[in-house]
Curated annotation (Swiss-Prot):
Classification via Pfam families: GlnD_UR_UTase, GlnE
Organism: Rhodopseudomonas palustris (strain BisB5)
Catalytic activity from the UniProt record: [glutamine synthetase]-O(4)-(5'-adenylyl)-L-tyrosine + phosphate = [glutamine synthetase]-L-tyrosine + ADP; [glutamine synthetase]-L-tyrosine + ATP = [glutamine synthetase]-O(4)-(5'-adenylyl)-L-tyrosine + diphosphate
Gene Ontology annotations of biological process type: regulation of glutamine family amino acid metabolic process
Protein name: Bifunctional glutamine synthetase adenylyltransferase/adenylyl-removing enzyme
Length: 989
C-alpha cells in the first residue's frame, strides 16, 4: 500500500486527526534534520506514510520534530518500531489502549515462563508509554485522563503478573484455587495501591507504591505450605517481573516501603499484624497515605474488607485538628521553608517545592483527616475530587477549589513533560536558563519568560492557599502564659522547659532571664528588646526540637553576645518567623554551623540577601563575588582574612540551604567545589605574586595545582579537606631564580608549596581557610612537597601503586596556565589509558577494600563511606572499571563517580541493571553524607539524634519516615555489596 493510501485511511477518531496542540521547536533546522536522518533509515513506504501524516496534520509534524529534539526517551520508542508509531497515529487511542491491554492479558495468560511474561509486559509498556505521551503532547487527553491511563496500565500490569505467578504456584501444587483461570480470587492475598496509583493519578515515570497483605488462614494454600514464605516469594516475584531492567526496558519500578515498619518486616505482611501495627503505632503520614489506598490486585473482596478494618485508624471520630500540625511537619520535611522572597524557576521541584503539587495534595488531605471521621463524604481518593467535596461542604471556598484545581492540573502537566524527556522519576525543572528555554518550548510555550510567568503565578497561588491553612493556632486553644524571665527559681518555667525536652532547665532558665531582662548589649534598646520578646516563646520551642537543645540555647546565647548591632537582625527575625525557624534549625541541627554563626555573626547577612533562596551561583558569579570581597583589601594578611570570611560565609550559606531543603545535596557538592576552586585559584595567584616579589622567577617556570579526591571529583561536603598536588616545571638549564634572594629548582618550589599550604592552614582571627592534605603526591609523605612534571610522569608510569592510579581517576587541574594544564592532562590520560590486567587490578582493589574494612570497620550502617556496600565500594567499582577499560574505551574516564558509572553503562562495560542500582545508591549516600558531615562531628547514632536532624535526614533521603530511610539504606548497601563482590571479588561481607 502506498503512503497516500495509508494516509487516506486515517479516520476522524484517529490520534493524528485529533491533534489539537503541539510543542514549539527550539532549533527547527536541527529538529528537522534529526527526524529526516531517522526517516532515511526507515523503509521507503513506511517513511513516506509517516511523512505524509506529519505533512497533512501539522501539529503531528511539529510534535515529532520536538520529540526528536527534546525527548531522547520518546524518540527511542519511535525509532525502535516505526510501524508502531504509524499504527498509533492512524488509530483511535482510547480503543487502541483498551485493545492493547486485552492483547497483553491474553498473551500473559498463554505464556509458559517468566521471561515470556516479561517480554509481553515490556512491549505493552513501550506502546502505552508512546501512545499516552502523544495524547498528552497533542492535547487529545486532559491531564487527569492521562493519569488515569497510566494508572490503568499499572493496575493491569500488577494484575496480569500476579495472576501468572499464582497460576505457576497452582501448577506446582502450592495453592488449590477454586477458579484456575483466576487463582487470585479467594486467595486472601491483597495488593493495595497507594498514593497516586490508588487515586488514579499516576505520573508518567512514577514508581508504583504497593503494600502486600495476606490472610494467615489463606483458604487456597495447600495444607503443607506456610503462608509467610509463600506470599513473600510471590511478592518478590511480582516486584522482579515488573521492575527488572532488560534490553527491552522495564514495566514499573516497585516500591514496597510504605508497609508498616519496613526496616524490620518482610515484604508481605499478615493482615493481623498490619491491623495491630496501625492500632498501636500508626502515624499521621500513614493515615494520610491510606486516604488514597485501593485494593488493586489479588483478592479484591478481602482487600475491601481490610480497608474497612483500617478505616477507624485513618478516620477519627472527632474533628482531628492535631493532624494539621502533623501534616505541616511532614510537608516541611520535603519542601523548602515558607517565607522565601524568591522562587527560582530553574531547578525548582514542581512536586515538593514551594507552591508545588504536594502543597495542593496536603491542603486537601489535611482537611480530609481533620473532618473525614465525622463527615464520610470527604473520604475520596483523587485530589480534585477532594477539592470538589471540600468546597461543596464549605470547608474551602469555591474560589480556592477552582484556583487550586487549575494549578494542580497545570503542574501535573509540567511534571509529565519533565519525565517524558528521559523517563526519569524527577520533578525538577532544568538548572540552567537555556535548558528551561528548551523545556518551555517542548511544553508548548514560545519562550521561557512566558512559561515562567504562568508557572510563578501558579506557585504564588498555591502558596497563598496553603499558607492560610496553616496560620495561627489550628486547635483554637489558648496556651497558659509562661514567665520566661522567671529564672531558675520559677518552678513553672522549669517544668515547662523540662516538658519541652531540655535536659538542663536550670541553665536554660538562667539564660532566658538574661535575655528577657536586657542583660546583653544588643538588648538594651527598648524597641529591639520588645521585638526580641515577641519571638522568644517560639524560639525556645524550636530549639527544643534540636539534636542537643541545651547546646542550641548556648549557641544562640553566644550569637546574642557576639552581636554588636543587633537591632536590624532582631527586627528581621521578629517579622519573619520562618527565618527564625531556619536559624533555630541551624543552631540545633548543625552545631558546626551554629558555632560558626556565633563566632562570625556577620555571615548572617547572607541569609538576608534576597538571592539566598534563588538559584545557586555558578563559578562565574562566585568569582565575581570573591573579587568584590577582595577588591579593596590592603596587606597580605587582610587578603587572607577576607578569604576566610568569604569561605566561611559560603560554607554557612550552602550548609543552611541544605538544611532548609532549598538546594539539593548534589547542587551543594558542586557549590562547595566551586567555592574551593575559586579560593584555591585566588590563593595560588596571591602566593605566587608574593613569593616572586621575594625570590624572583626561574626561567620558563610553571606551577599548577592538581585537585584530587572530593575536590577533584566535585563531590565535596561541608567538612571536606583539600587533597592537592603541586606540579611545576622550568628551564632545566637555568634553575636559579632571578630575585634578590635566589633559590634553586626543587628548593624554590618546595618553599613555594610550604607558603601555599600556610596560606590555607594558618589560623587568623577568622580561623583556617581549609585543611590541606598533600599525601596523594608521589611517594606520599616520603616524597617532596612539589613534583616536577617529568618526575611526576615517570613516577606514575613506573613506581605508582594501583591505589595511586585509582586516585588519579579523580585528578583535575584547577589552577594553571592553559598550556601547562594541557601537558599535565596528557600525562594523566596516558597513565590512565595504558593497558592493564583486569584480574590484577581486581585483586588489588579487593585487597585494598579488605584492608580498609580491617582498619575502619564496615558494620556501621550509618557510616555511608566505609559500611559494607557503602560509598567506598561504589567508588572502587567506578575507578576499577576506568582502569581496566580506559585503554580500549578512553571515553569511560570521568572524575566523578556518577559520571564514570554513566560512561561505563553507556559503553556497555557495566550492566544497565547494575548501573540502575549504583546510581541511586551513590546519590542516596551522598545526600545523607552531606547532612551528616554538616550536623554530626562524630559517629551518627540514631537513638541519640534529635528530631531536627532526623527530619532533615528523612527529607534528604526522600523517605516518609526514619524507619523507612533506614530500611532503604540497608537494602541499598546489600545490593551494592553484591555488585562489588560480583565485579571485583574478595567477598569481605
Amino acid at each position: 500500500m502506498n503512503s497516500s493510501a495509508i494516509d487516506a485511511d486515517i479516520p476522524p477518531s484517529a490520534l493524528a486527526a485529533r491533534f489539537a496542540a503541539g510543542p514549539q521547536l527550539h532549533a527547527p533546522e536541527e529538529a528537522e534534520k534529526r527526524l529526516a536522518d531517522w526517516l532515511g533509515d526507515v523503509p521507503a513506504d513506511l517513511a513516506g506514510a509517516i511523512r505524509s501524516v506529519a505533512d497533512r496534520h501539522p501539529h503531528v509534524g511539529v510534535a515529532l520534530r520536538s520529540i526528536a529534539e527534546a525527548s531522547p526517551y520518546l524518540f527511542d520508542l519511535i525509532r525502535a518500531d516505526p510501524a508502531r508509531l504509524l499504527g498509533l497515529l492512524r488509530s483511535d487511542p482510547e480503543a487502541g489502549f483498551v485493545a492493547l491491554l486485552d492483547r497483553a492479558s491474553a498473551a500473559v495468560a498463554a505464556a509458559s515462563d517468566e521471561a515470556e511474561v516479561m517480554a509481553v509486559l515490556r512491549k505493552m509498556k513501550a506502546e502505552a508509554a508512546l501512545s499516552i505521551a502523544l495524547c498528552d503532547i497533542g492535547g487529545l487527553w486532559p491531564v487527569m485522563q492521562v493519569t488515569q491511563a497510566l494508572t490503568d496500565l499499572a493496575v493491569n500490569s500488577v494484575q496480569m503478573t500476579l495472576r501468572f505467578l499464582l497460576r505457576q504456584e497452582a501448577a506446582r501444587g502450592r495453592i488449590i484455587p477454586p477458579n484456575s483461570d483466576a487463582p487470585e480470587q479467594g486467595s486472601g492475598l491483597v495488593v493495595l495501591a497507594m498514593g497516586k496509583m490508588g487515586a488514579g493519578e499516576l505520573n508518567y515515570s512514577s514508581d508504583i507504591d504497593l503494600i502486600v497483605f495476606y490472610d494467615l488462614d489463606a483458604p487456597t494454600l495447600a495444607p503443607d505450605i506456610e503462608p509467610q514464605p509463600f506470599f513473600v516469594r510471590v511478592t518478590q516475584g511480582l516486584s522482579r517481573i515488573l521492575q527488572q531492567r532488560r534490553h527491552d526496558g522495564y514495566v514499573f519500578r516497585v516500591d514496597l516501603r510504605l508497609r508498616p515498619d519496613p526496616a524490620s518486616t518482610p515484604v508481605a505482611l499478615s493482615t493481623v499484624s498490619a491491623l495491630n501495627y496501625y492500632e498501636r503505632e500508626g502515624r499521621t503520614w500513614e493515615r494520610a497515605a491510606m486516604i488514597k489506598a485501593r485494593a488493586c490486585a489479588g483478592d479484591l473482596v478481602a482487600g475491601e474488607a481490610l480497608l474497612g478494618d483500617i478505616a477507624p485508624f485513618v478516620w477519627r471520630k472527632h474533628l482531628d485538628f492535631a493532624a494539621l500540625s502533623d501534616v505541616h511537619d511532614m510537608k516541611r520535611q520535603m519542601q523548602t521553608f515558607r517565607g522565601q522572597t524568591e522562587v527560582a524557576v530553574e531547578g525548582h521541584n514542581v512536586k515538593v517545592g514551594r507552591g508545588g503539587i504536594r502543597e495542593i495534595e496536603f491542603f486537601a488531605q489535611t482537611q480530609q483527616l481533620i473532618a473525614g471521621g465525622r463527615h464520610p463524604e470527604l473520604r475520596v481518593r483523587p485530589t480534585l475530587a477532594a477539592l470538589d467535596i471540600l468546597a461543596a461542604r464549605d470547608w474551602i471556598t469555591y474560589q480556592a477549589r477552582d484556583e487550586l484545581s487549575v494549578a494542580y492540573q497545570f503542574l501535573r502537566r509540567v511534571e509529565h513533560r519533565i519525565q517524558m524527556i528521559a523517563d526519569e522519576q524527577t520533578h525538577t525543572l532544568p538548572d540552567s536558563v537555556e535548558a528551561v528555554e528548551r523545556f518551555s518550548r517542548f511544553f508548548g510555550y514560545e519562550s521561557r519568560e512566558a512559561f515562567a510567568r504562568d508557572l510563578l503565578a501558579y506557585f504564588d497561588c498555591v502558596q497563598g492557599h496553603y499558607g492560610k491553612l496553616f496560620e495561627g493556632d489550628p486547635t483554637g486553644t489558648v496556651k497558659l502564659p509562661i514567665d520566661y524571665a522567671g529564672g531558675p527559681d520559677d518552678t513553672g518555667l522549669l517544668d515547662h522547659l523540662h516538658g519541652l525536652g531540655y535536659k538542663k532547665p536550670l541553665m536554660v532558665a538562667t539564660t532566658l532571664q538574661q535575655w528577657m531582662t536586657g542583660g546583653y548589649r544588643i538588648l538594651k534598646v527598648e524597641t529591639t528588646q520588645r521585638a526580641f520578646h515577641e519571638f522568644v516563646p517560639m524560639l525556645i520551642e524550636e530549639l527544643a526540637r534540636a539534636e542537643e537543645p541545651d547546646n542550641a540555647v548556648n549557641a544562640f546565647d553566644r550569637l546574642l553576645q557576639a552581636l554588636h548591632r543587633g537591632g536590624r537582625l532582631i527586627s528581621l527575625l521578629s517579622q519573619n518567623r520562618d527565618l527564625l525557624t531556619l536559624v533555630a534549625l541551624v543552631l540545633g541541627a548543625a552545631p558546626r554551623l551554629g558555632d560558626m554563626l556565633a563566632r562570625q555573626p556577620q555571615i548572617l547577612d547572607g541569609l538576608i540577601d534576597p538571592r539566598f533562596f534563588g538559584a545557586m551561583p555558578d563559578r562565574a558569579e562566585l568569582s565575581a563575588r570573591l573579587a568584590a570581597t577582595l577588591a579593596d583589601a590592603g596587606p597580605y594578611e587582610e587578603f587572607l582574612d577576607r578569604l576566610r570570611l568569604f569561605g566561611q560565609e559560603s560554607l554557612f550559606l550552602i550548609g543552611t540551604r541544605i538544611l532548609s531543603g532549598t538546594v539539593s545535596t548534589q547542587q551543594a557538592s558542586v557549590a562547595f567545589a566551586d567555592v574551593a576552586e575559586g579560593i584555591v585559584g585566588t590563593v595560588h595567584d596571591l602566593v605566587s605574586e608574593q613569593f616572586i616579589s621575594q625570590y624572583g622567577r626561574i626561567k620558563d617556570q610553571q606551577t599548577a595545582i592538581l585537585a584530587m579526591g572530593k575536590l577533584g571529583s566535585r563531590e565535596m561536603t561541608a567538612s571536606s579537606d583539600l587533597d592537592l598536588i603541586l606540579i611545576y616545571d622550568f628551564d632545566h638549564e637555568q634553575p636559579d631564580s632571578d630575585g634578590e634572594r635566589s633559590l634553586q629548582g626543587a628548593q624554590y618550589f618546595a618553599r613555594f608549596t610550604q607558603r601555599l599550604i600556610s596560606a590555607f592552614t594558618t589560623r587568623t582571627n577568622y580561623g583556617v581557610l581549609y585543611d590541606v592534605d598533600m599525601r596523594l603526591r608521589p611517594s606520599g609523605r616520603a616524597g617532596p612537597l612539589a613534583s616536577r612534571l617529568d618526575s611526576f610522569a615517570e613516577y606514575q608510569e613506573v613506581e605508582a601503586w594501583t591505589w595511586e592510579h585509582l586516585a588519579l581517576t579523580r585528578a583535575r587541574v584547577i589552577s594553571a596556565s592553559p598550556e601547562f594544564r594541557e601537558r599535565i592532562e596528557q600525562v594523566i590520560r596516558a597513565v590512565l589509558t595504558r593497558p592493564r590486567d583486569a584480574a590484577i587490578i581486581a585483586n588489588d582493589v579487593a585487597e585494598m577494600r579488605h584492608a580498609i574494612a580491617q582498619e575502619k570497620g564496615e558494620d556501621d550502617v550509618w557510616d555511608m563511606k566505609y559500611a559494607a556496600g557503602g560509598m567506598v565500594d561504589i567508588d572502587f567499582i567506578a575507578q576499577y572499571l576506568q582502569l581496566v577499560h580506559a585503554a580500549a574505551t578512553p571515553e569511560i574516564l570521568g572524575v566523578s563517580t556518577l559520571g564514570a558509572i554513566d560512561n561505563a553503562a553507556r559503553l556497555g562495560v557495566l550492566a544497565q541493571s547494575d548501573a540502575e542500582v549504583l546510581r541511586p545508591a551513590a546519590r542516596l549516600y551522598h545526600d545523607l553524607t552531606q547532612i551528616l558531615r554538616l550536623c554530626v562531628s562524630d559517629k551518627f547514632k540514631p537513638e541519640t539524634a534529635g528530631e531536627d536532624l532526623l527530619r532533615v535526614l528523612v527529607r534528604a533521603g526522600d523517605a516518609p519516615d526514619f524507619s523507612s530511610l533506614e530500611a532503604r539504606v540497608k537494602e541499598t548497601q546489600a545490593e551494592v555489596r553484591a555488585i562489588f563482590n560480583r565485579l571485583i571479588g574478595g567477598d569481605s561481607a
